[in-house]
Amino acid sequence: MPPRRSHKKSRAGCRRCKNRKIKCDEVHPRCGNCAKHGVPCDFSNPDVLEELAISTNTSTESVGAPTPSPAPTVNFNSAPRTPLTRPRAPSSPARAPRPNPSPPTSVYSQPSISSSTNTIDHGERMLELRLMHHYTNVTSKTLLTNSPAAEDIWQRAVPQMAFSGNGKTYLADAILSVAALHLRSMSPNDKALVRASHAYSASSLSAFGASLGAGITPENAEALFLTATLIAFQASASRIFVKDDGDAAPGDPTVRYVPPLSWFHAFQGVKTVVANSWQWIHHSDIVKVIIDSQPSFQLNLNPRSPDSFFGHMLEGLADELSNEDPRLVASTTQAYSHAVSVLNWAHKNYHAAAALTFTATVSKRYVDLVDARRPRALAILACFFALLKRMDNVWWLQDVARREVMGLVSLFEPGSKWWRHLEWPIRIAVLDGSSIPQDIWGTELEEQAPEQQNVLGSMTQHIEMFAEMLNQHTQPPIPIADEDLIVPDSPD
């Protein structure tokens, strides 16, 4: 009998496969075993994002009060109502906290040391140098920055901040993870890049979550904002590696299309981090350039106005809500109306990247409606993905419009009344390339939305309003003692 071939054991599998002691194919964002059994996979909703999506506590500890409150967490699904600080001692939590996964070693944390040669592992070092080189020279220029100044920030200032260290390994690992994803998109069969993208993502998420749990401070606010942005980018870019089920027949019971809720969780997480750290980062030259590069958020609050391209998405809403829980009627109406308003704004905007604002600005109620597979919410989501067609030449958005729109369409029954509302996104999705004729797009693009009385202002004003609503009832951060600092588990 020939000897068994040796193999290198991977620790990058999902938690469910590890618990079941079966081999994980490590396909992101949902491994083959989880997809086969129709169960959630922590690749599609990583631990830290899942934990950070838990609603924060509604009460805070009064200064000097004898009874401390539980440590709040960032809510990646909805706005938290407590500051991102950590009390000195937590009270009894509702559930036991999960230990942080052991992050992979890197030259930015604790490098791999050979017991015989006492040197850094050459292969790991060369891979990290390759990833950082690719990020600074290529990937940083694909982040849809809208301005040369913002591009320079991501290309030069962000890596410099990562190099400065100060214990902020999560920013360096987030950079390496994004670079690995980019290289992996060009070499999908390179297993080293697959493992690297998984490992650096897990490491970044673990350290990022620990830092958020300890609290946002003037010292870490910039790095946390930049890392949250790169995590959101990872959540979006990882979607290109999902098995394509967009060509399934409508109503096909075997279809496994799942709407990418991770996009919403991650981008709304960026908004939450920004709002909770705004008192510090709005003075940052780095953050100011990034925020100012975003299109002016002039939102018409009347989605049923005569020039509303997507106003038809609200037809029949009153009749639909007659069977809704009375406690949810107002929030559901507002969720749909606001989502349509954002679509109208992005549809006319000269800057194609304006469409990505949708994932960060829609309400938690709308995300819940998508999760519940409400037809109206899914039709609106199909229009959002159709808007991304203008960026089909960007590597992490390539073919996303077609795949996601057709995937969403597959969730509708053949005789659904919603088919006429899906005609426009389907027409856009099946086009070749990112150049779309104006008669098909449906409107003329505007450099800036026209001034109107009933609009929201600049992106900075929008953030300041959100931050004020978030923090008007909060207290000053509680100082953190050395013994309160979270230390990640040591590697096996």
Swiss-Prot record:
Location of the region described as Disordered in the Swiss-Prot/TrEMBL record: 58-119
GO cellular component, one term: nucleus
Gene3D superfamilies with a match to the protein in the record: Zn(2)-C6 fungal-type DNA-binding domain
Transmembrane segments: none
Self-association state and partner proteins as the record states: Interacts with HOG1.
The entry's keywords: Nucleus, Phosphoprotein, Transcription, Transcription regulation
MF terms in GO: DNA-binding transcription factor activity, RNA polymerase II-specific; zinc ion binding
Consequence of gene loss (knockout): Reduces the production of ergosterol. Leads to increased sensitivity to azole compounds, but not to iprodione and fludioxonil that target the high osmolarity glycerol (HOG) pathway.
Name the UniProt record assigns to this protein: Zn(2)-C6 fungal-type transcription factor
Chain positions found as Phosphothreonine: T82, T217
Positions of modified residues (Phosphoserine): S92, S102, S305
CDD domains: GAL4 (cd00067)
